[in-house]
């Protein structure tokens, strides 16, 4: 039998960026074999993106640096090759699909690489059509990129790299900008493509539970520029390495730990549906549920933000929001959820005054906001956009965060104290004198959050506040927001992160096709399968676990878990 040869091989490999004093990767030894599905996980700054950049050639050809050791990619000596040559072996799907579009239509974008290689037109059309069919986008070849949803854009990006018939597909945080249902479909698509083509698949992602919706062969855990673990999912989830290195384990695994269940590889904890629980394990969960008190009822609150009969459309005859009405109380922490294109971001623009409603009114502290201009609204409502590049206007991190305080009447010393305190909370203090251009997408996101939080607004409205964040920075940001909320600041978050919704907000507003279809507790939303499907959300694995163990009502199981999780985060039992 012939010896199996790796398609990717790192041997004693180190990489140091030209602008850095120390190597970002140190003594990497890793082999990945043809047809494998490998998840590369690690906290922000761990080196996982640098590792991926060495595989696809971005390092050192676009990001100059020095390599030692060897790296072979599909038989090619990667550090001594070229970006062009490596692109014939490795196809990369970026975190932000908008950054990968080149053509004016879907068809043109998919065919771009074929045009560069002077492929005959008839052959080009056939290959483009086949790639589009493979990813299920064949009916959109004439569409412009802006006419596509986030999930459709990602499919186009995938088709664009598959026309080269690459042997390796690398996905850089493929779930970061997708709603839960579309993210689930993305993982299913990656799994389907891998099975059809036997392509080697590498996924860089923070959202471990979502990636494990479909099987992966191994999880490579990276931190501090080294590989800490290279294990099967069942093995890694049985230990404590994930939590120790800032990676969130699946919620059902945490629930089992709270109940005192011993998690071992033979219980197959990689997916809630494959989980093997004996009678003793099930009884431990039931006993834990019985022993936990019901969460206290939430008090009635004086309204802060009131929306009444709100309707809006960007074009005549097309309504993005239809007759939306709700009230948010002072000191509440609320999630706004729903599929991409449901109207969530449009609602935030109307609240901030960036757009004017066609009908309806918005009130803050009982006063109509229509009488306030954008500048005056901003004194009360802080808004953090989803895309940090659309907010940043300064070159340096410190200057960006301090910008809003320049006309506040504070002294330079007072400004410095406020800015540095906020930077510490957001995990940016070590980078305070860095240029923003040197930051990752996730780090830029933290800069924009810091620039709003430093102003102490009455209400903070955040569009995807934790997108691209590892669990440690996610927790730092959310605990900071929770601390503000505990002091009476109202926090409203537009999010695709169902964990965030459950863990930090007791109430969720659910949107679908421009309408508010539910206003319920977060647990109630994710324990309603019909609502979950309608709004393109994702059932929590806690709901599945409760049903498997015969614990009813499942919603109370979820609520009691979340309550204990809050206690643990706050240093309780």
Regions found by a protein language model. Name each.
Residues 122-140, 413-431:
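Conserved ABC ATPase "signature" region
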Residues 64-76, 360-368, 377:
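Conserved ABC transporter NBD signature motif
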Residues 144-148, 152, 435-439:
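Conserved ABC ATPase signature
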Residues 226-252, 515-542:
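Conserved beta-strand-loop-alpha-helix hinge in the C-terminal portion
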Residues 56, 352:
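Helix-to-loop junction immediately C-terminal to a conserved catalytic motif
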Residues 41-43, 337-339:
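The feature captures the beta-strand-to-loop junction immediately N-terminal to the Walker
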Residues 169-172, 460-463:
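Catalytic Walker B motif of ABC-type/P-loop ATPase nucleotide-binding domains
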